[in-house]
UniProtKB/Swiss-Prot annotation:
InterPro entries tied to this protein: 7tm6_olfct_rcpt
Organism, as annotated: Drosophila melanogaster
Keywords: Cell membrane, Membrane, Olfaction, Receptor, Sensory transduction, Transducer, Transmembrane, Transmembrane helix
Subcellular location: Cell membrane
Protein name: Odorant receptor 74a
Length: 404
């Protein structure tokens, strides 16, 4: 099945380079990653069948995780041991299978990204290097999430050493799951759920980051081209033609700007619900993780690593959102400082000067509002929103600690 999963290509037809977290996301997560557009009917049917079975597995895990919380509702410490895995399970079930429902739309977005937006290292080495620096936090976060998963996968090792039969996560089954014919398949399902959840966590973050930072680079490129066009025309064009040439260049730049904004809106449409769900669960998840890490650090190393991973994920996404917001906000000011007044001063064509001033006014109006990604229009993805979530999480922690 992995051979039929979509592999992005550049406009020339060659395979597009993908960062290692996205490549790993593609390999590990058959639920979220789309198939190739030309996949056969049986391949599509088998993929949908696997998604349906995966959904049932998530429902089963949801049930037994919740039973653990109910069984330990009188013991806050034990209940909070199982709460983080339950919260992340519910969050990922919503995000992952919502994406699975819209796989074709996601593939179309990736196709457009690599066809129109992607900044290659060969064409723009400086911009590409800047993107890699901006994405460094998401790469580190991917490594930390894998370390968090590894901590859970140490459970089978301790099972062998201490002759126990414990699941990877805190779960209560309505039957004796320690019987070998139940235990082994259930443990395998635990592993599968762990891979799907972890790959979704770092994979989607890196996909969003790539889309946002390459879009950001295109906006930077747009501003550079606008400034260069005025400088070149002032040096080369005659006083009669300079306004005409600049107006044509400005029209072309405005069309490029509209195309970039349209792509940004497509990104917003694709991710807005999943971002909302991510942020909605984050405060409670951070609170529970920090509580476990704070109350027993040496006994909850997995929770400490997981807390760091979640904390870094939110900060990385907020930082990328703030970068895009800042760039598009500055783009509105760019039209004020694009030397159009020098073009009008040099031009002797009064009619074209009037048309140019009207076009500049339109450009300023169109770019008066910066572009930003939101969570169902409730909040902007930015460091400000992330800091509010972190503040809320620590407020909940203070309350829980006082209850203890």
């Amino acid at each position: 099945m992995s051979f039929h999963r979509y592999r992005p290509r550049l406009p020339g037809g060659e395979l597009a380079p993908m960062p290692w977290p996205v490549s790993l996301y593609r390999v590990l997560n058959h639920v979220a990653w789309p198939l190739e557009a030309e996949s056969g009917r049986w391949t599509v049917f088998l993929d949908r069948l696997m998604i349906f079975l995966g959904f049932l597995v998530f429902c089963e895990h949801n049930e037994v995780d919740f039973h653990y919380l109910i069984a330990n509702r009188q013991d806050m410490d034990n209940m909070l041991t199982g709460l983080p895995t339950y919260l992340i399970l519910v969050e990922m079930q919503i995000r992952c299978f919502q994406l699975a429902w819209h796989k074709d739309r996601f593939r179309a977005l990736l196709q457009r990204f690599y066809a129109e937006i992607y900044v290659s290292e060969e064409m723009e080495p400086h911009l590409f290097a800047s993107i890699q620096r901006q994405m460094l936090a998401t790469r580190v976060n991917s490594t930390v999430y894998l370390l968090a998963l590894l901590n859970f996968f140490l459970v089978p090792v301790t099972n062998v050493i201490y002759h126990r039969r414990e699941m990877l996560y805190k779960q209560v089954y309505p039957f004796d799951n320690t019987q070998l014919h139940f235990f082994i398949p259930l443990l395998v399902l635990n592993f599968w759920v762990g891979f799907i959840i972890t790959s979704m966590l770092f994979g989607e973050l890196n996909v969003m980051g790539e889309l946002m930072m390459h879009l950001n680079a295109r906006y930077i490129q747009l501003g550079q081209d606008l400034r260069r066009s005025a400088q070149m025309l002032l040096k080369k064009s005659s006083s009669l033609n300079v306004a005409i040439a600049y107006r044509l260049n400005l029209t072309h730049i405005l069309r490029r700007n509209a195309a970039l904004r349209d792509f940004g809106q497509r990104v917003e449409k694709e991710f807005t619900l999943r971002i909302f769900v991510m942020f909605a669960f984050s405060a409670g998840l951070l609170c529970a993780l920090f509580f476990k890490a704070f109350t027993n650090p040496w006994g909850n190393v997995a929770y400490i690593v997981w807390f760091l991973a979640k904390f870094m994920e939110l900060l990385a996404l907020g930082m990328l959102g703030s970068i895009l917001l800042k760039t598009t906000d500055e783009l509105g000011m760019m039209y004020y400082t694009a030397d159009w007044e020098q073009v009008i001063h040099q031009s002797d064509n009064v009619g074209e000067n009037v048309k140019l001033m009207k076009l500049v006014t339109l450009a300023i109006q169109l770019n008066s509002r910066p572009f930003f990604i939101t969570g169902l229009n409730y909040f902007r993805v930015s460091l400000t929103a992330v800091l509010k979530i972190i503040q809320g999480a620590f407020s909940y922690f203070t309350f829980l600690n006082s209850m203890r």
